[in-house]
UniProtKB/Swiss-Prot annotation:
UniProt similarity note: Belongs to the lipase chaperone family.
Name this polypeptide is given: Lipase chaperone
Taxonomy, superkingdom: Bacteria
Function (record text): May be involved in the folding of the extracellular lipase during its passage through the periplasm.
GO molecular function (one): unfolded protein binding
Length: 344
């Protein structure tokens, strides 16, 4: 894999800096199973104290060091905190799903039994000896049952995203499986996501209804938007603004604008703070590309040295840790490495 292959388009990378918003319903992520977005935070929903409904994080503990039993795909990272309520029980929060999705990132490295053991250790590292420990284990088993049920669907639940009827059926099917396997955890795990998907699907149905005039479509879309809770409506407005910003960034990149010219343009459309974040992102991206290129060269030398698979992987993991020292960088590099391997 070349350094160029490791580059995400700047407009897409901007999500890390608060410039972009939600993915469209037609995106692949809508139909994926578990998919915690690691390290960089790109395009993922990060645990949020407010979203946890006032839930407190688990009592502060030292995070497990990367060398303590972490699979290579998670090297250099630490698990999200499991939230607790005021009584010390596991809080019903999306943050719990984020924790398990983080652990599931390692499923390509581990057998099912080893993955279970890994999750048990990660839970114990935060909740050992508490009532919440048993609760977290129970929720993990439920979540695994949910994912196993999804895997048994035809084509693992994949649908033709141009078939709105199939999308509706898939949504209903997944919601049913979630409620059956997760019970009262289905709402904190998937409630907000399902609401957004149903809303987006309703918009698509209106937009693609050939019996409606443009004026009627606009009227129905406006009425649908009024059904949104106030906070969701405000969030949607921000998303619309951010999508416009993405388009503008892409246009500036395509025109070959200099960093100073891009910053001046973005200051007009996004404001000085957002423009400064994009400028910083450019610098960080350039630094990343340079370091990944050097790393890829050294990794290729290790791969061609005729080492045993275990020695080769150990040396590459050590190289990755030396090269990428910021939180999440080693995980990102490992993910790019796996992508390079699958493309060969």
């Amino acid at each position: 894999m070349t350094a160029r292959e490791g580059r995400a388009p700047l407009a897409r990378c901007a999500v890390v800096y608060g410039v972009v918003g939600l993915a469209a319903i037609a995106g692949v992520a809508m139909w994926s199973g578990a998919g915690w977005h690691r390290g960089t935070g790109t395009a993922g929903e990060l645990p949020d104290a407010a979203a946890a409904g006032g839930a407190a994080a688990a009592p502060p503990q030292a995070a497990l060091p990367a060398s303590t039993g972490l699979p290579s795909s998670l090297a250099g990272s630490s698990a999200p905190r499991l939230p607790l309520d005021a009584g010390g029980h596991l809080a019903k929060s999306r943050a719990v799903r984020d924790f398990f999705d983080y652990c599931l990132t390692a499923q390509s490295d581990l057998s099912a039994a080893a993955l279970d053991a890994f999750v048990v250790r990660q839970i114990a590292a935060q909740l050992d000896g508490t009532v919440a420990q048993a609760e977290a284990l129970d929720v993990w088993h439920r979540y695994r049952a949910y994912l196993d049920a999804l895997a048994k669907l035809r084509d693992a639940g994949a649908v033709d995203k141009s078939d709105l009827g199939a999308l509706q059926l898939a949504l209903d099917q997944r919601a049913s499986i979630a409620y059956r396997t997760l019970g009262d955890w289905s709402q904190p795990f998937f409630g907000a996501e399902q609401w957004r998907q149903r809303y987006d699907l309703a918009r698509l149905k209106i937009a693609q209804d050939r019996t409606l005039t443009d004026a009627q479509k606009a009227e129905r879309l406006a009425a649908l938007e009024q059904q949104m809770p106030a906070d969701e409506r405000a969030a949607q407005q921000r998303v619309d603004q951010q999508r416009a910003a993405i388009d503008r960034i892409a246009q500036l990149q395509k025109s070959g604008a200099t960093p100073d010219a891009m910053r001046a343009q973005l200051t007009q459309t996004l404001g000085p703070e957002a423009a400064a974040r994009v400028a910083q992102m450019q610098q960080d991206d350039a630094s990343w590309q340079s370091r990944y290129a050097d790393y890829a060269t050294q990794r290729a030398e290790i791969e061609s040295a005729g080492l045993s698979p275990q020695d080769r992987d150990a040396q590459i993991a050590a190289l990755r840790q030396r090269t990428f020292t910021k939180p999440g960088e080693a995980v990102r590099a490992a993910s790019l490495d796996r992508g390079a391997g699958s493309a060969q």
